[in-house]
């Protein structure tokens, strides 16, 4: 396997091996080692045709053509299966150093994993399973073979193809270059939330997803052994990295991730201009002084352009609705809290900038 040193940057040229992955994989609960995660990455790489098909059709519950799915396998005690044939070189191994692969596959047979439940109004998937007694059901790996046949529960294949819950892309070579299992999990998370600029997660949920043992009971251990090393490993070497802050204490503590991405100056200028123009017209539509935008926009990072635009849209929509409601009420104080639109917008945006918990979505809910 190609080894990439800590100081070797992974630029955008490394993105040609991007893999699609449903967002639920980033939240998978299980005591998965680094090699287990790499095996999962390889298995997902064999589902790319099916994932691309579902993503391109954009219809809930669409059936994937049989030709795009792994071959049907034997009926096991756990039900129907699908078999994926994998070259051992895909794991970064050669026939001479793959002896322990059998051990890792054996571990995955009895490795319980749980995906997040999926619920969305008007969309029912009665056949969907979220909890599995093993990530795989069986494997066939003859001595000296250059390939291994891995059997997956058919219900697991369906779960890995649940694009209705959202999906993301990440670089396979980048994920394989990471040498810490927790950093891989964080890499998946920030890739799935990059369009939102960041996310908030409770400490208890973070522990649960990463299956942290008693050695991480103290938050200081999580900071020193997981968050800080992951941030340092990704920053400057990957085209996507993160900053983080914590709020609260004890089990009420929240970790807030701010996601950073490498973009060209041209792309930054183009998207900044678009967001500026839309925000300018939105503020003008509610009678706000557009100089507010000049004062605040200089503080907006590229990753926060979309969240900033969303915030301005929410503010102006709320102001319009409040004014409309006030016309039908006799209470003169009903609209008092936004009687000064400029002060209201400025205060709301300043609070949005100062508190990352307001800026980003809480994924623990």
Model feature map: region roles:
Residues 1-295, 299-312, 316-365:
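Charged, alpha-helix-forming regions
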């Amino acid at each position: 396997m190609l080894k990439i040193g800590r100081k070797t940057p992974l630029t955008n040229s490394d993105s040609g091996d991007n893999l699609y992955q449903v967002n639920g994989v980033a939240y998978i609960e299980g005591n998965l080692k680094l090699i287990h995660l790499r095996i999962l990455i390889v298995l997902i790489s064999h589902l790319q045709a099916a994932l691309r098909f579902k993503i391109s059709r954009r219809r809930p519950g669409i059936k994937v053509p049989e030709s795009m799915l792994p071959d049907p396998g034997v009926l096991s005690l756990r039900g129907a299966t699908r078999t994926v044939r994998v070259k051992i070189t895909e794991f970064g191994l050669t026939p001479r150093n793959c002896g322990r692969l059998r051990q890792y596959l054996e571990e995955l047979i009895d490795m319980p994993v749980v995906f997040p439940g999926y619920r969305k109004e008007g969309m029912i998937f009665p056949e969907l399973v979220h909890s599995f007694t093993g990530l795989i059901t069986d494997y066939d790996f003859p001595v000296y073979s250059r390939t291994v046949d891995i059997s997956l529960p058919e219900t697991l294949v369906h779960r890995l193809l649940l694009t209705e819950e959202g999906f993301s892309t990440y670089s396979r070579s980048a994920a394989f270059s990471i040498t810490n299992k927790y950093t891989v999990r964080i890499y998946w998370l920030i890739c799935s939330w990059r369009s939102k600029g960041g996310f908030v997660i409770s400490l208890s949920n973070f522990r649960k997803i990463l299956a942290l043992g008693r050695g991480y009971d103290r938050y200081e251990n999580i900071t020193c052994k997981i968050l800080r090393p992951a941030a340092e490993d990704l920053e400057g070497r990957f085209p996507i990295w993160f900053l983080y802050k914590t709020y609260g204490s004890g089990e009420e503590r929240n970790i807030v991730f701010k996601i950073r991405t490498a973009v060209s100056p041209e792309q930054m200028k183009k998207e900044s201009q678009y967001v500026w123009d839309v925000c300018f017209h939105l503020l003008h539509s509610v009678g706000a002084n557009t100089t507010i935008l000049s004062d605040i926009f200089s503080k907006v990072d590229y990753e926060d352009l979309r969240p900033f635009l969303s915030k301005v849209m929410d503010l102006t929509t709320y102001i319009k609705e409040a004014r409309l409601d006030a016309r039908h009420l006799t209470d003169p104080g009903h609209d008092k809290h936004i009687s000064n639109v400029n002060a209201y917008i400025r205060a709301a945006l300043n609070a949005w900038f100062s508190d990352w918990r307001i800026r980003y979505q809480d994924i623990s809910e």
